[in-house]
Swiss-Prot record:
Transmembrane segments: none
One annotated GO molecular function: ATP binding
One Gene Ontology CC term in the entry: cytoplasmic side of plasma membrane
Keyword ATP-binding found: yes
CDD domains from the UniProt entry: MinD
Family indicated by similarity: Belongs to the ParA family. MinD subfamily.
Pfam families, per database record: CbiA (PF01656)
Matches recorded under InterPro entries: CobQ/CobB/MinD/ParA_Nub-bd_dom, MinD_archaea, MinD_FleN, P-loop_NTPase, ParA/MinD_ATPase
Sequence positions that bind ATP: 15-22
Record keywords: ATP-binding, Nucleotide-binding
Name of the protein: Uncharacterized ATP-binding protein MJ0547
Species: Methanocaldococcus jannaschii (strain ATCC 43067 / DSM 2661 / JAL-1 / JCM 10045 / NBRC 100440) (Methanococcus jannaschii)
Cited Gene3D superfamilies: P-loop containing nucleotide triphosphate hydrolases
Lineage of origin: Archaea, Methanobacteriati, Methanobacteriota, Methanomada group, Methanococci
Length: 264
């Protein structure tokens, strides 16, 4: 069991579309639900969207302002769901152009001092911001989809992380639909040579929650994906948690047949 306290965790992926930001946001809220003081920072200063998932879009001061030397980090911290401290990157192209990514390491250290757990939502791929975030973090979680192209891209992230000397916590396999073409957990662990610390199923509730700007674990806490994320959060801090999935409602026809013939 992985147990993490007072740590900065970089969450990265080899390519876009894995659901990395959704995992970052909801994992932060899930950890807060367990009573931890948590912050989540959007290090994807070019393609920021963490603020949309956390319901904090349009904030006047963002990480890009801080990286441009136009604001202090304390002014770019906002309280989000479950008391999670959120540092949005902002969506302004003008502010992005002024931002200096090399200041990110300094910012991360300042935020880390305020909380028990800092979640860093890295940009997809292996760009400058990702490398800075990973090197500044205590541990890495790589988010993958159960397909060979996603796993192949994740190998690059893992190799660079090892070279940077940052610990690798493990992988989260996201958007699993159990199709025959998908790679299984054992195969993924064999290829990546890191443990899979959680499997999050494909779940229509994820898009619904995002559309309302509310984290999944708050809006649909009983959904399969939310329960999987809560289990991952519990594993990270060494807490006990049992998934409480609602049973599907029995159809009218099923009830009718049982009533007609009885259970055998």
């Amino acid at each position: 069991m992985v147990t993490l306290m007072a740590i900065a965790i970089a969450i990265a992926s080899g390519k876009g579309g894995t659901g990395k930001t959704t995992i970052s946001a909801n994992l932060a809220v899930a950890l807060a639900k367990f009573g931890k003081k948590v912050a989540v920072l959007d290090a994807d200063i070019a393609m920021a969207n963490l603020e949309l998932i956390m319901g904090l879009e349009g904030k006047p001061v963002t990480l890009n302002d801080v990286l441009a030397g136009k604001a202090d980090i304390k002014d770019a911290i906002y309280e989000g769901p479950e008391g999670v401290l959120v540092i949005p990157a902002g969506v302004s192209l003008e502010k992005f152009r002024r931002a200096k990514p090399e200041k990110l390491e300094e910012v991360l250290k300042a935020i880390h001092d305020l909380v028990e757990i800092l979640i860093i939502d890295c940009p997809a791929g292996i760009g400058k911001e990702t490398l800075i975030a990973i090197s500044s973090a205590d541990g890495l979680i790589v988010v993958v989809n159960p397909e060979i192209s996603s796993i192949s891209d994740a190998l690059k992230i893992i190799a660079i992380t090892k070279r940077l000397g940052t610990d690798i916590i493990g992988a989260i396999v996201n958007r699993v639909s159990n199709e025959s073409t998908e790679l299984g957990v054992k195969a993924i662990e064999t290829i990546l040579e890191v443990p899979v610390i959680g499997v999050v199923p494909e779940d229509p509730h994820v898009r619904k929650a995002a559309a309302f700007g509310t984290p999944l674990v708050i809006m649909y806490p009983d959904s399969p994906a939310a329960q999987a994320i809560m289990e991952i959060a519990a594993k990270l801090i060494g807490a006990k948690y049992e998934a409480q999935l609602k049973k599907k409602k029995e159809s009218f026809i099923s009830k009718f047949i049982k009533g007609l013939f009885g259970r055998r």
